[in-house]
């Protein structure tokens, strides 16, 4: 019966055979790859584009993230691209003509120590300076925003306050991917699933196409948007990326009536919690410490995040875990992304988003499309070049990442 519904994803875009050549080939059919294709078509009139996905569309990190959207980052460069992304989020449901349930319910980032308080107040002032909505809340005000949180002083790390971004929130991740895919397909973009890139065609230090499990595809330009497998793709192309891949786990509970009205994050005790539209509690924590490409992780990470969640939200002690899963996040040494040209001519890369990839989806697509179309970075992504790891102009956002990297 579900196959007959008009919103079933098979009816939203075509599944063509790959052509022999394209102006642009985008490797990675997740949110970032699809957003890039959409903005190439919309903003730059480039529609002879193929998005190649090795599995099913948006079946990687796009299907596995915890859907949090915010822009309250510390440094000017980060605030710029994430705030641009948030503004795009606010207009995309109408622009894409698709309701992906973007809910601006606000995000609380908790402070548990005097050090947390000082850093949080600093972050609020920096956000205001950059035009990002931000407030500092006392524990009592935190309780007003989220009535079920425990602000007592009898827990391991008492809540001493929180930063609050009212415009932040969550969205339905699958629907976001489908919305971008549908609109890009309408504009002439080919979306090709079950097509894994196995190598690159090169003429000296210039990329001219890709080798795939469905044949060779020639391309004027190639963009990499493979998230956790970006370093593997870069190695195939003949250069190295300064990233490491780690598993990142999440879990959901059984369904409940609405009890959790906002998003709560705690870097100090490594847990973040929201309630999805259907009613399940969605929780995440820090990355697993080891490197790997497995979409699973160690149980102790789940165990520790559940203990932290129950301490902050005693009511959750009665909840049952429905399922857990993992994604593969690509992290840089400064916890900031790479949206850049590469040492290979006509090859571009978007990676290194770590745990912040979903919230950056529109901004990543917008800036990468500009970089591809003009062969030079947009002002928003110029600071996120590969060269910063040589010059030392790093953008250290470990504190804003909300979980341990």
UniProtKB/Swiss-Prot annotation:
InterPro entries: FAD-dep_OxRdtase (IPR006076), FAD/NAD-bd_sf (IPR036188), Rhodanese-like_dom (IPR001763), SoxB (IPR006278). The modification Tele-8alpha-FMN histidine is found at residue 173. It comes from Corynebacterium sp. (strain P-1). Its EC number is 1.5.3.24. Heterotetramer composed of subunits alpha (SoxA), beta (SoxB), gamma (SoxG) and delta (SoxD). May bind to both the delta subunit and the alpha-gamma complex and thereby stabilizes the association of the delta subunit with the alpha-gamma complex. Gene3D superfamilies: D-Amino Acid Oxidase, subunit A, domain 2 (3.30.9.10), FAD/NAD(P)-binding domain (3.50.50.60). Utilization of tetrahydrofolate is probably the physiological reaction since the products are substrates for serine hydroxymethyltransferase, an enzyme which is part of the sarcosine oxidase operon. This is Sarcosine oxidase subunit beta. It is found in: Cytoplasm. Pfam families: DAO. One of its GO terms (cellular component) is cytoplasm. Keywords: Cytoplasm, FAD, Flavoprotein, FMN, Nucleotide-binding, Oxidoreductase. Its main location: cytoplasm. It is an enzyme of class 1 (oxidoreductase).
């Amino acid at each position: 019966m579900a196959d007959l519904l008009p919103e079933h994803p098979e009816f939203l875009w075509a599944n063509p055979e790959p052509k022999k050549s394209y102006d642009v080939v985008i490797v990675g059919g997740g949110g970032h790859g699809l957003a890039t294709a959409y903005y190439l078509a919309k903003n730059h009139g480039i529609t002879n584009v193929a998005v190649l996905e090795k599995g099913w569309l948006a079946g990687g990190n796009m299907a596995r993230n915890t859907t949090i959207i915010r822009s309250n980052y510390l440094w000017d460069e980060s605030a710029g691209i994430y705030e641009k992304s948030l503004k795009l989020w606010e207009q995309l449901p109408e622009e894409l003509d698709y309701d992906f349930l973007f809910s601006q319910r606000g995000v609380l980032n908790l402070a548990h120590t005097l050090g947390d308080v000082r850093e949080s107040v600093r972050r609020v002032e920096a956000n205001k300076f950059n035009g990002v909505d931000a407030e500092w809340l006392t524990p009592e005000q935190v309780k007003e925003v989220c009535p079920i949180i425990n602000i007592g002083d009898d827990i391991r790390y008492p809540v001493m306050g929180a930063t609050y971004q009212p415009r932040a929130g969550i969205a339905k991740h699958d629907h976001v991917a489908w919305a971008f895919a549908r609109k890009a397909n309408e504009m002439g973009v080919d979306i090709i699933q079950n097509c894994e890139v196995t190598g690159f065609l090169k003429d000296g230090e210039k990329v001219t196409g890709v080798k795939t499990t469905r044949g060779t595809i020639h391309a004027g330009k190639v963009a990499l948007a493979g998230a956790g497998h970006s370093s593997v793709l870069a190695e195939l192309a003949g250069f190295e990326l300064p990233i490491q891949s780690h598993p990142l786990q999440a879990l959901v509970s059984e369904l409940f009536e609405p009890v959790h009205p906002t998003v709560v994050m705690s870097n100090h005790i490594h847990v973040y919690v929201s309630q999805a539209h259907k009613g399940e509690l969605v929780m995440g924590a820090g990355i697993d410490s080891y490197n790997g490409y497995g979409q699973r992780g160690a149980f102790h990470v789940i165990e520790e995040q559940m203990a932290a969640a129950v301490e902050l939200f005693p009511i959750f002690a009665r909840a049952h875990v429905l399922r857990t899963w993992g994604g593969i996040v690509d992290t840089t040494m400064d916890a900031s992304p790479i949206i850049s040209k590469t040492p290979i001519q006509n090859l571009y890369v978007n990676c290194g988003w770590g745990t912040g990839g979903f919230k950056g989806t529109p901004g990543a697509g917008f800036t990468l499309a500009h970089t591809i179309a003009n062969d030079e970075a947009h002002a928003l992504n110029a600071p996120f070049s590969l060269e910063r790891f040589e010059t030392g102009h790093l953008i250290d956002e470990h504190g804003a990442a909300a979980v341990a990297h």
